[in-house]
Amino acid sequence: NADKNIELKVKEIIDSKIAFDDSNGDKLFKKIIEVTNGNSQTVILDFDGIDLVNTAFLNNAIGRLFDKEVYNIEKNRVLIRNMDDTKKDLLKETISNAVKRYSDRVS
């Protein structure tokens, strides 16, 4: 079913309530790449049960999704669920840094 969203529970993928280092970020990133391979479905990242996140995790898990060489964010949109404002602020910062980093590289 092409219009069905893919939901990923972050806590299950990294097997922890603390999304805290780059290797856990890698795990989530790889999973996103895996589930979106060959389709154009939207991915929902559910942060339910995650107590802590840091930038190392977010850079690797989500920042790299803005690298057009490895991921097409226009084709596979990514939505975030169950994330409090503190974590969202960190995420926004991560995304704006990633967008800058990857767009600078292209030009």
Label each region the model flagged.
Residues 1-9:
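Flexible, glycine-/charge-rich segments associated with ATP-binding catalytic modules
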Residues 10-43, 47-99:
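Amphipathic alpha-helical interaction surfaces in cytosolic regulatory modules
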Residues 103-107:
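Extended, charge-rich low-complexity interaction segments
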